[in-house]
Curated annotation (Swiss-Prot):
Belongs to the SGF11 family. Component of some SAGA transcription coactivator-HAT complexes, at least composed of Ada2b, not/nonstop, Pcaf/Gcn5, Sgf11 and Spt3. Within the SAGA complex, Sgf11, e(y)2, and not/nonstop form an additional subcomplex of SAGA called the DUB module (deubiquitination module). Interacts directly with not/nonstop. Interacts with the AMEX complex component xmas-2. Interacts with Cbp80; important for promoter recruitment of Sgf11 that is not associated with the DUB module. GO terms for molecular function: transcription coactivator activity; zinc ion binding. This is SAGA-associated factor 11 homolog. Residues 180-196 have a biased composition (Low complexity). GO terms for biological process: chromatin organization; mRNA export from nucleus; positive regulation of DNA-templated transcription; protein transport; regulation of transcription by RNA polymerase II. It is found in: Nucleus, Nucleoplasm; Cytoplasm. Residues 1-22, 144-196 are annotated as: Disordered. The modification Phosphoserine is found at S172. InterPro entries: SAGA_su_Sgf11 (IPR013246), SGF11 (IPR051078). The keyword Methyltransferase does not apply. It comes from Drosophila yakuba (Fruit fly). Component of the transcription regulatory histone acetylation (HAT) complex SAGA, a multiprotein complex that activates transcription by remodeling chromatin and mediating histone acetylation and deubiquitination. Within the SAGA complex, participates in a subcomplex that specifically deubiquitinates histone H2B. The SAGA complex is recruited to specific gene promoters by activators, where it is required for transcription. Required for nuclear receptor-mediated transactivation. Binds independently on SAGA to promoters in an RNA-dependent manner. The long N-terminal helix forms part of the 'assembly lobe' of the SAGA deubiquitination module.
Length: 196
């Protein structure tokens, strides 16, 4: 058999009007060539040419598809040198990100003020009136309101209040005096002015 009689794939001889062969046709034709020991050289050339043509056509088809779909640049990849350059500018780390601390501000939902993040919790506590001092002020207001209402009841002749209400007022005055004495010592409790 000569090379002109052999079936080829579309790219084997370079002409576009040849009929593409299937793998079963290629295998069957190769088996026929192997039956005769004189044709082994021709069979090996045929097999090599068929495999080479198949690989080349596959690469051409894949490249054409990538070019038409716009993905051909993805084969080139990204140049490695530019991505791994270190930044040597002041106030930037090696990746070019700023190392300076940025002040974080929060907006108070109650009064719509900008407050530093570190001061947001204490501000919100005072702003909403929920802090320790605010609760003390609120309890004093309640005590004065109850005292005023009980005085009003006493003046009307109704004795609805109890003696415990008077005790609360008396004990709170005592606490104030004690706290004033502690503040005179300037917070020092070591020796209370005594020398050893």
């Amino acid at each position: 058999m000569s090379a002109a009689n052999m079936p080829t794939t579309t790219g084997a001889q370079g002409s576009g009007n040849q009929v593409p062969t299937t793998s079963t046709t290629i295998v069957n034709h190769f088996r026929e060539l192997i039956k005769d020991p004189k044709n082994l050289d021709e069979a090996s050339k045929y097999l090599f040419q068929t495999l080479l043509d198949d690989a080349v056509v596959g690469i051409f088809n894949e490249t054409h598809h990538l070019r038409k779909s716009g993905n051909l640049a993805a084969l080139d990849g990204v140049p490695e040198d530019s991505t791994y350059r270190m930044c040597e500018m002041p106030n930037l780390d090696i990746f070019g990100i700023s190392t300076a601390k940025k002040p974080m501000d929060c907006t108070c939902p109650n009064c719509d003020r900008l407050v530093a993040a570190a001061r947001f919790a204490p501000h919100l506590e005072k702003c909403m009136g929920m802090g320790r001092i605010s609760s003390r002020i609120a309890s004093r207001r309640l005590a004065t309101k109850e005292g005023a209402s009980s005085a009003h009841l006493h003046s009307a002749g109704n004795a609805g209040g109890t003696d415990d209400e008077d005790d609360v007022d008396w004990s709170s005055d005592k606490r104030r005096k004690k706290s004033n004495q502690n503040s005179r010592n300037n917070g020092s409790k070591k020796n209370n002015g005594k020398t050893f």
